[in-house]
């Protein structure tokens, strides 16, 4: 059985943990043996670099819920830093209290857009010491598809699903893309 909770989503949450336990939520979980490859947390928006490293070393996963985080204004998890540190990344919809749709297709699209916007916010012009243009390379369509499929299977411990290959279990969804809302679609894998 996998362990799951919501963690490090808002500044108020961090302040409350620091006040009550004199540590961050991730540090609290580490102290109570609640990290590991059988644990995954929703959100993980507010993390220190050493927490990202700890989550990676322990193989603790994340369910990124971009629409919920956007609706609540809590921020956007740095999925690329998490993934580079070894954190298994997946996508989630959070719950009805903060996501009206629970639609994984629009969640994947939001993850793609918001990861790019997050990195773009860090871009500076060259005269100010900037070294990159923006966030266009922050998340690819392939990243988002991986997070929404293989990443989800990994954090749930579903070794026989998550990819389309011989011998694996799979469910397929087919969408019509001839609706006017798809006319500007550049990549069918990331359509809203």
Each language-model region and where it sits:
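Short, function-defining helix-loop hinge/capping sites that tune catalysis or transport
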Residues: 14-17, 51, 102, 115, ...
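Short, acidic/turn-prone active-site loops that include or flank metal/cofactor-
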Residues: 9, 66-70, 94-97
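C-terminal cap of metal-dependent C-N hydrolases
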Residues: 169-192
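Glycine-rich nucleotide phosphate-binding loop and flanking beta-alpha elements
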Residues: 48, 70, 97, 112, ...
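His/Asp/Glu-enriched, well-ordered alpha-helical/loop segment
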Residues: 31-38, 80-176
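Short, charged, surface-exposed secondary-structure boundary motifs
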Residues: 71-76, 100-102, 185
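Histidine/acidic residue-rich metal-binding segments in metalloenzymes
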Residues: 1-61, 70-89
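Short, glycine/acidic-enriched loop or turn micro-motifs at the edges of active sites
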Residues: 9, 46, 97, 174, ...
């Amino acid at each position: 059985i996998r362990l799951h909770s919501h963690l490090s989503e808002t500044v108020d949450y961090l302040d409350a943990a620091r006040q009550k336990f004199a540590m961050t939520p991730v540090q609290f979980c580490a102290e109570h043996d609640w990290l590991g490859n059988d644990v995954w947390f929703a959100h993980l928006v507010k993390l220190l670099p050493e927490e990202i490293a700890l989550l990676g070393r322990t193989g603790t996963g994340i369910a990124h819920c971009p629409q919920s985080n956007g609706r609540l204004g809590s921020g956007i998890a740095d999925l690329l830093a998490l993934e580079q540190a070894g954190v298994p990344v997946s996508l989630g919809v959070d719950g009805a209290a903060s996501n009206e749709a629970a639609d994984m297709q629009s969640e994947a699209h939001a993850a793609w857009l918001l990861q790019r916007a997050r990195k773009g916010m860090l871009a500076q012009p060259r005269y100010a010491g900037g070294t990159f243009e923006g966030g266009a390379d922050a998340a690819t369509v392939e990243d988002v598809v991986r997070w929404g499929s293989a990443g989800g299977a990994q954090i749930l411990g579903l070794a026989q699903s998550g990819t389309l290959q011989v011998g694996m279990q799979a469910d397929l969804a087919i969408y019509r893309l001839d609706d006017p809302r798809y006319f500007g679609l550049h990549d069918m894998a990331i359509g809203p």
